[in-house]
């Protein structure tokens, strides 16, 4: 059976079905490798050049999957650094899909929904995609889901989190929006709720994994 390895931040908040860190999300085996000291506060930063790469390189060396990914979209810049060290397919972030999607959608037609819109910027986007920096929208700073993730809380109200994501989605889209990318790997569980607001093309870490390792993701989460 195929295996997906996830280099996961050192967090304890709930990872529900649809999250890249939950075994129920996949049809294949899931291997979780915790990256020591890689907290949300350290990784969610405006300046990814300040990231300490060594813990991620160590975690990568332990991975045994047919595909290796991470649990945070802010790690997008690691694609160019870690991929050459990887013998299998490596996906640092859902944002890696933007390079291809930028040939299909304009910044006006594609929105990026992130955990923290104040910190995600051009430095996290693929080369040639800086124009999409204006398409970035985030969770409300006072939202329940953001509080759970930021403070690494042990409990999550899924209904409140769903409302938070739908609220961010509504602010991120207009009548011209044709697609969205969910940067944050904790957002895919709420795709059914998003689609009840508006039927739209949704790209996230799971669609990236599935396109590179077919039949790995449980179809209900695509």
Predicted regions and their residues:
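Charge-patterned, long linear interaction tracts outside catalytic cores
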Residues: 160-194
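N-terminal active-site wall of soluble small-molecule enzyme domains
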Residues: 50-59, 74-81, 85
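Short, flexible loop segments at boundaries between secondary-structure elements
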Residues: 201-222
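Short hydrophobic/aromatic-enriched beta-strand-loop microsegments
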Residues: 87-95, 109-114, 199-208
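Short, well-structured alpha-helical segments in soluble
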Residues: 49-64, 163-176
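Gly/Ser/Thr-rich loops at beta-strand to alpha-helix junctions
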Residues: 12, 69-79, 94-97, 115-119, ...
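N-terminal glycine-rich anion-binding loop in soluble enzyme alpha/beta folds
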Residues: 1-51, 114-156
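Short Gly/Thr/Asp-enriched flexible loops that form oxyanion-binding sites at enzyme active sites
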Residues: 76-88, 190-198
């Amino acid at each position: 059976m195929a295996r997906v390895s996830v280099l996961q931040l050192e967090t304890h908040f709930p990872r529900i079905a649809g999250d890249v860190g939950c075994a129920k999300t996949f049809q294949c085996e899931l291997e979780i490798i915790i990256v020591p000291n890689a907290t949300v506060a350290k990784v969610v930063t405006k300046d990814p050049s300040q990231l300490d790469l060594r813990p991620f390189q160590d975690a990568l060396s332990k991975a045994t999957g047919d595909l290796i990914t991470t649990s945070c979209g802010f790690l997008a810049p690691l694609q160019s650094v870690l991929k050459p060290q990887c013998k299998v397919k490596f996906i640092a972030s859902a944002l890696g899909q933007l390079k291809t999607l930028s040939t299909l959608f304009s910044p006006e037609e594609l929105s990026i929904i992130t955990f923290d819109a104040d910190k995600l910027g051009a430095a996290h986007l693929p080369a040639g995609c800086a124009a999409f920096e204006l398409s970035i929208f985030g969770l409300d700073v006072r939202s329940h889901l953001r509080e759970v993730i930021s403070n690494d809380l042990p409990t999550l109200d899924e209904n409140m989190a769903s409302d938070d994501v739908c609220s961010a989605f509504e602010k991120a889209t207009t009548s011209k929006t044709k697609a969205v990318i969910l940067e944050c790997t904790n957002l895919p569980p709420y795709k059914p709720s998003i689609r009840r607001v508006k039927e739209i093309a949704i790209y996230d870490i799971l669609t990236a994994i599935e396109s590179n390792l077919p039949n790995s993701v449980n179809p209900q989460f695509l």
